[in-house]
Amino acid sequence: MIFRDNQSIYLQIAERICDEILENKFPPGERIPSIREYAALVEVNANTVVRSYEWLQQQEIIFNKRGIGYYVSPEGKHHIKAIRRERFFNDELPLFFNRLYTLGISVEEIDTRYAEYLSKYLNK
């Protein structure tokens, strides 16, 4: 795994696991790799993956069955989407709106472009 400098490694690993959950690589109720397995997979120290798993547990995305392993929570996907929606609305959307304003792009033009995007990429 290639890591970026602008975010903690444990959070990048947690984001990757969230992506895998959203892609159904790890469906709700299914066991995810052990800490050691995942550490070997992404080539980091096991303590880093421990922090990732702790963060995912705090967000109620995964849970631990003591002595058995970590599992995707039944509502794990919902929690991931809620976290990402909040991050989008609080962090990304204000920057996007600022860019629209400074470039003089109208809401109508965005609406047109969004409709084109949907028809091109999602309505095949």
Where do the protein language model's features map onto the residues?
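Residue cluster at the C-terminal edge of the helix-turn-helix DNA-binding motif
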Residues: 41, 58-61, 120
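A short alpha-helical element within helix-turn-helix/winged-helix DNA-binding domains
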Residues: 31-42, 56
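Beta-hairpin "wing" of winged helix-turn-helix
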Residues: 25-26, 30, 58-67, 71-74
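Short, cationic-aromatic polyanion-contact patches
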Residues: 10, 14, 34, 70-86
